[in-house]
């Protein structure tokens, strides 16, 4: 009897497949992506590599040593303190505790602060609270801390917003009115996002993470791109990450353009240059998971799309890999066997510069991804490499070389806890364990500024406050 291997379906259910079936599923998945995106399918060697990863006997797998990448985040601390019946585990804790738990306990390379409603529009009435939380977090933390939220243009339509729902207008054959409603909503999205981030950046935020860009279609992406453009013009040093909602931009409007390019129907490799043109530092491409297909099919398809996006992108790519995207099953508690295999494949085959950790419980998302492919933050040098990707738009290889040279170590040492533990204490750039007298928070980040020859926003704020 042929040997069968334990894989997953797109909904997380376990399924057993032979090697021949796995190879067949990989071929079908990459062919689907190649056909839709008009991009190259995976080569025979790449498909063999993917099959090898999927058939590895261990419950968890990880990237080869030296191939680790930094991670960014969606949903912030909501995966810890959230309790809405989704992936939040309902631990009563402050957002400061949540952020520092990711930094000190999970080994995160970066982190983000976010509102419980996690959209920019609801932040407006409570922006002062968000600014206070950001200031307190920045005073205590060392790794880059973003403010994260969804553009979520749907909130600008009735009954939640001021503009008539374009779906209702289209059903009434009021096409022109539907277009105008989307255009007005996009303008308000841009305005609100810029206003919120002006406040947060003035409170020390390292930058902004636009999560699920394009969720409401091409108007949503249009408004977000213009927000990125405005923020980059006003704040040249702001870290900006733009993560997508789906693999293909839905043409709800159909005629909206950015930089002369029609947004409707763009695939990840076509989205990347526009996001870079707008002024983002990091692009978060997406490939949606099909819950009725196997993990072999889904992962092959996702890796194919992401490989093309990485090659086309002028800026680093942090592939979105929460539940339901990036080859990850659509399950609130993502199976760690599937998560770690997807994580490894994205790094070793697609060549991503990082991973944006999305929705999922703490063990199934940040812990699994960081164990599989992360640089482990302050335990090593992950936060330093992440800062170079965002402050100078460096791809992963260049960022590692730069940081290694500044530290006077080999690139392999950047993820060596033994080397970095002593070196971080010697340089006083923040250490993960509590040592009395060692630089923490702002003090550690000021030393990082000198080491890497960069400016950090929270340090600039502190200098203004004591001037």
UniProtKB/Swiss-Prot annotation:
Induction: Induced by growth on trimethylamine but not methanol or monomethylamine. Part of the mtbC-mttB-mttC-mttP-mtbB1 operon.
Record InterPro entries: Dimeth_MeTrfase_MtbB (IPR012653)
Keyword Methyltransferase set for record: yes
Keyword Transferase attributed: yes
Biological pathway: One-carbon metabolism; methanogenesis from dimethylamine
EC number: 2.1.1.249
N-terminal signal peptide: none
GO biological process, alphabetically ordered: methane biosynthetic process from dimethylamine; methylation
Molecular function as annotated in GO: dimethylamine methyltransferase activity
Subunit description: May form homotetramers or homopentamers.
NCBIfam families, per database record: dimeth_PyL
Family to which this protein belongs: Belongs to the dimethylamine methyltransferase family.
Function: Catalyzes the transfer of a methyl group from dimethylamine to the corrinoid cofactor of MtbC. The major or perhaps only DMA methyltransferase expressed under inducing conditions.
The name this protein goes by in its record: Dimethylamine methyltransferase MtbB1
Organism: Methanosarcina barkeri
